[in-house]
UniProtKB/Swiss-Prot annotation:
Keywords: ATP-binding, Cell membrane, Cytoplasm, Membrane, Nucleotide-binding, Protein transport, Translocase, Translocation, Transport. PANTHER family: CHLOROPLAST PROTEIN-TRANSPORTING ATPASE (PTHR30612:SF0), SECA INNER MEMBRANE COMPONENT OF SEC PROTEIN SECRETION SYSTEM (PTHR30612). It is a peripheral membrane protein. Part of the Sec protein translocase complex. Interacts with the SecYEG preprotein conducting channel. Has a central role in coupling the hydrolysis of ATP to the transfer of proteins into and across the cell membrane, serving as an ATP-driven molecular motor driving the stepwise translocation of polypeptide chains across the membrane. This is Protein translocase subunit SecA. NCBIfam families: SecA2_Mycobac. The keyword Translocase applies. The lineage of its organism: Bacteria, Bacillati, Actinomycetota, Actinomycetes, Mycobacteriales.
Length: 777
């Protein structure tokens, strides 16, 4: 059984760091020196009273964090404050991590090394320098937990701290954002930014100007969810996709009426299927100019929902509703939905009443949201593997932080099998073998269906396993906390951002030594993910803080990452005839898996870059609208412009309406038409994005065409909004019972709501190519 100890980030060469977007050895060495120097002030800090410690923190000169001579004193004060407030005395490596975040890096710290404490110290450092800090988490639970946990430390240094969740009121949000340090999920920060684009009075604004974003699970937020659009919608009447098409597609036969590609990421009608659909819809021509951008798109979207999106893999059904599963986190993607047609098609497929999304009033991607901040830094257990994306899209460096104690986890080379069935049998036998020793086992699966199937098999074999997936994620913290207990077998979907350490011997570590003697936590992966980062997040659950641990991944030539990225005809098929278990004996197997994973990562980077090019223009246009809106909201520009455009009408109204009231009326009119124009523009962009890839048929570059159409449409937006505002100003009736104008026709949505759009449900660029395959007949 060959075992390999994976290289730790701290041992990588400087050249390798730079290739991965890591910060230079020189910068890291300076930070190490500052940490060492801070120990000279430890005794002095320990001798201060709580009040003196608070005052000492306030006297620090940290305005220029890169050059401040007070950094060692700050670290000593932070170490002492942490111990008093939380009972945790930071290790040198945690102070090093905090310093690298204060330098604007994303740090890589292994699971269990204390990222949360390092992040709180960095947040305090920025706040003491006069900055406003948003600690960005991946969910509400972690935002509240970390704020309550680390709040006493931040307050011990004379600073204020607040937190925001989905339940927070506008007043609570405003108060939390007013604190020096604010903990909130990326969703809630984004939704507040969007909702602020509807206010017509400065006093109603909630979200402040962005300053510092310190991001927990930075690779998950900045890479995995970078292109997820956050959406603000309002009530309106919109037609849902035709149910007759959804029903018709459900009756088509695989292999005859439609085909899928090798990795089941694209589906298209065959000639036979196209003719069947055309006949059922009254003899239309799907590929005519009349139907190619409408009916054909509806058919392809319905086909996508029926064939490619699988229940308990891509979504679950709970309480008569479809809930998307976040593949990178293994849990329900709260508030997420697919684009309108696809969401309705999946709901119809499951026999659920289709939900209304309303009209999109504003939208922003997570990437655009984060890029608003003047300073971005963060922390995660797997930053180096995301270094290229962090550098390319955010200009961020990565600092690997060595563990406090050497990592002694043993990682076995992959066990590779010819078929998935042989692999699954081997996984069950392996878990039973390890379980019989009492060593705790954590099994990481790739989706809900796989986790439940494996769980059932283990129960049938007498193994009392517990399962954690999107269906029971409310039990998450308790299940994970006990996963290191003697004899426990835990089957879980993706481990990213679980937020709870697995301690040997259970949450109270009562059996720590007994479990350690058995080898610590044993991690089993049921297959490679499409990115090494997710594999490493699972591996990293074992061997925390110098504890023993081990890991092994089981793979097969039928796994998705292999089928999509390697030529099956070139794969070694030699097995051991004596065992007859279907396990590949070729030493090349593990290397081929690595290659398949690198190809998959390259494809995902291409998708990210391509989608970013589309979103970048929208983000630029949105920034222009936001700037114009802020000007109208905060100044007298609306009144001045309407007075210039309609001087006669303005003079007439000025004689009847007080100046302050007239200014408010002008502002409401201008803001309404600007918001109306932006919403219409977003709807137009969504429409052209749906069919833009058809431009390739005319040998046009889809991206260039999208940019041309979007720029042309945007060019007239501001002028049209001003013209519409002028018309309203000149024609609105004067109210009889009070000074003012009748603006009842400028009705805003009676209700609004927010959600996220999963634009790439298969982690591929499938949606943008839905209309292409069936076009070539």
């Amino acid at each position: 059984m060959p075992k390999t100890n994976r290289a730790q980030p701290g041992r990588l060469s400087s050249r390798f760091w730079r290739l991965l977007g890591a910060s230079t050895e020189k910068n890291r060495s300076r930070s190490l020196t500052l940490v060492t120097d801070s120990s000279e002030y430890d005794d002095e800090a320990a001798g201060l009273t709580d009040e003196q410690l608070r005052k000492a923190a306030g006297l620090l000169n940290l305005e220029d964090l890169a050059e401040s001579e007070d950094i060692p004193q700050f670290l000593a004060i932070a170490r002492e404050a942490a111990e008093r407030a939380t009972g945790l005395r930071p290790f040198d490596v945690q102070l090093l991590g905090a310093l690298r975040m204060l330098a604007g890096d994303v740090i890589e710290m292994a699971t269990g090394e204390g990222k949360t404490l390092a992040g709180a110290i960095a947040a305090a450092g920025y706040a003491l320098a006069g900055r406003h800090v948003h600690v960005v988490t991946i969910n509400d639970y972690l935002a509240r937990r970390d704020a309550e946990w680390m709040g006493p430390l931040i307050e011990a240094m004379g600073l204020t701290v607040g937190w925001i969740t989905a339940e927070s009121s506008s007043e609570e949000r405003r108060a939390a954002y007013g604190c020096d340090v604010t903990y909130a999920s990326v969703n809630e920060i984004g939704f507040d930014v969007l909702r602020d684009q509807l206010v017509t009075d400065v006093a109603d604004l909630v979200s402040p100007n962005p300053d510092v974003a310190l991001i927990d699970e930075a690779d998950s937020v900045l890479v995995d969810e970078a292109l997820v659009p956050l959406v603000l919608a309002g009530t309106t009447h919109r037609e849902t996709p035709r149910l007759e098409i959804i029903k018709l597609v459900g009756e088509l036969e695989a292999g005859t009426d439609y085909d899928t590609d090798a990795d089941s990421r694209n589906v298209h009608l065959t000639d036979v299927g196209a003719r069947k659909v055309e006949k059922a819809l009254g003899g239309i021509d799907l590929y005519s100019e009349e139907h190619v951008g409408t009916t054909l798109t509806e058919v392809n979207v319905a086909l996508h929902a029926h064939v490619l999106l699988q229940r308990d893999v891509h979504y679950i059904v709970r309480d008569d509703a479809v809930h998307l599963i976040n593949a990178s986190r293994g849990r329900i993607a709260q508030l997420q939905r697919w684009p309108d047609g696809l969401q309705a098609a999946v709901e119809a497929k499951e026999g659920i009443e289709t939900t209304e999304t309303g009209e999109v009033l504003d939208t922003i991607t997570v990437q655009a949201l984060i890029n608003r901040y003047a300073t971005v830094c963060g922390m995660t257990g797997t930053a180096l593997a995301a270094g290229e994306q962090l550098r390319q899209f955010y200009k961020l460096g990565v600092s690997p932080i060595p563990p406090n104690k050497p990592n002694i986890r043993e990682d076995e080379a992959d066990r590779v099998y010819i078929t998935a069935a042989a692999k699954n049998d081997a996984i069950v036998e392996h878990i039973i073998e390890v379980h019989e020793t009492g060593q705790p086992v954590l099994v990481g699966t790739r989706d809900v269906a796989e986790s439940e199937e494996l769980h059932e098999r283990l129960l049938r074999r007498g193994v009392p396993a517990v399962v954690l997936n999107a269906k029971n994620d409310a039990e998450e913290a308790q299940v994970i906390a006990e996963a290191g207990k003697f004899g426990v077998v835990t089957v879980s979907t993706q481990m990213a951002g679980r937020g709870t350490d697995i301690r040997l011997g259970g949450s109270d570590e009562a059996d720590h030594d007994r479990v350690a003697e058995l080898g610590g936590l044993h991690v089993v992966g049921t297959g490679r993910h499409h990115t090494e980062r997710l594999d490493n997040q699972l591996r990293g659950r074992a061997g925390r803080q110098g504890d023993p641990g081990s890991s092994v991944f089981f793979s097969s030539w039928e796994d998705d990452v292999v089928a999509a990225n390697l030529d099956r005809n070139k794969l070694p098929m030699e097995t051991d005839p004596e065992t007859g278990d279907g396990r590949i004996v070729s030493p090349k197997a593990a290397g081929l898996l690595d290659h398949a994973q690198r190809v998959a990562e390259g494809r995902m980077l291409d998708v990210h870059a391509n989608t970013w090019r589309y979103n970048q223009l929208i983000a630029q246009q949105r920034a222009i609208i936001v700037d114009r809106r802020n000007t109208l909201l905060r100044t007298a520009t609306a009144r001045e412009e309407l007075a210039e455009l309609a001087p006669k009408r303005y003079r007439e109204l000025a004689e009847e309406i007080p100046e302050e009231r007239l200014e408010t009326i002008c502002r409401h009119i201008m803001l309404y038409h600007l918001d109306r124009g932006w919403a219409d523009h977003l709807a137009y962009l969504a429409d052209i994005r749906e069919s833009i890839h058809l431009r390739a048929l005319g040998r046009q570059n889809p991206l260039d065409e999208f940019h041309r159409l979007a720029v042309d449409a945007f060019a007239s937006l501001a002028a049209d909004a001003i013209e519409a505002a002028q018309q309203t100003f000149e024609t609105a009736n004067v109210l009889e019972d009070e000074p003012g104008l009748d603006l009842s026709k400028l009705a805003r949505p009676t209700s609004t709501w927010t959600y996220m759009v999963n634009d790439n449900p298969l982690s591929d660029d499938t949606l943008s190519t839905l209309s292409l395959p069936g076009v070539f007949r």
